[in-house]
Amino acid sequence: MKKIVALVLALVMVLGCTAALADTYGLGISSSIGSSKDAADGADGKAQVDSTVCALAVDADGKIVSCLFDVAQTKIGFSAAGAITADKTAEVKSKQELGDDYGMRGASGIGKEWNEQADALAAYCVGKTYEEVVAGVAADEKGYATGADV
């Protein structure tokens, strides 16, 4: 969720600096390979790219009128020898496309799937300005939300 909040804040700040238009649209993408694993001790490795996406529209008053979040979590297995073991033709579905099949509900303290939590955050942002979103989402020094989950 840290990346999602950062994307919203960055997009709103950039869009808020543009000239007053009927609606201004933005798309932010943040990618990370931090979940990748090296092949070690004869075990296979995993290359993983997590791309977090936020699309939003801001009105002439700087209020968010539309907000959508998604994450593409692309995992590519490889052998200790470096050969790709993943199905190169397999479709990579985003977390929104997976819905309940993503499987976060059981690990969620509030019993919500990833897409439900992302949709709730997006709904929270609609109707607010950048300043209101920032003020309403308390975070620690690492950017993790410190308030109650949605």
In which residue ranges do the predicted regions lie?
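Positively charged n-region of N-terminal signal peptides that target proteins for export
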Residues: 1-9
